[in-house]
Amino acid sequence: MLKVTFLVLAMLISIPMKAMAEDPLDLDGFAFPQPAASDLGKAYKLWATYYYLPEIQEDSGTIALRDMKGQELGPRLTLKHWCDTAMEGSVKINYKNGDIKTFNYQGVTNDYFVDCKSIFPRHTGIGKTKFREANGVYGDGLDDYILSPYRTLATDVTYITPGTALYIPKARGAKITLPNGRVIIHDGYFFAADKGGAIKGSHVDVYIGVSKSAPFFSWIGSNESKTFEAYVVKDQKIIQDLLELHSIK
């Protein structure tokens, strides 16, 4: 019996565990310096929308999150929460036992269609969305990037290449109060680490984490006529630091 116990323990220890990312907000001081003109490159005239991470309680509804094979992932959501999750691309689930998991967009299939027409009349295709457990605390972006609140931009990858750091002067000095009471004074730097089907050309989507709206970023006008200036960052140290905030440690 003792040998069996040791064998089971050895097997458990040898099973590779999923890498868990640290919370980017715990690592981010939002304290990059104001750039010199020589540290900035190409200028863009952009317009912005924002997206966020829905946060809900376990088993709040009856509609399952499913993976690409149609298998249930565990959580069951209300129609509104499910459609919000499909639209935003990720969801944070608070379990009754205290666990927290984030699930992320994986792809689309035609089976197990969820009718979101009553929630998003112009985006009925999101009902085909399938999910997986995310690597990042706030969800995953392109390739191996994780999402970092108030830093990540979803871009048209043919217009702004993933891995590009951008400085937005109008974002510098923005005051953001987090749910835990921490106050961030934004330094104006962002990082292209995600994409979206509706993101084309000069349109960027700003990730705001668990905030539900973005009054602190007045330059986000959700309208292509409301443009602002952004500049490519050339400072390699800042680029590397932003990359690390979007990487699993």
Residue locations for each model-derived region?
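Bacterial N-terminal signal peptides
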Residues: 5-14
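Solvent-exposed, well-ordered loop and adjacent helix/strand elements within mature globular domains
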Residues: 22-249
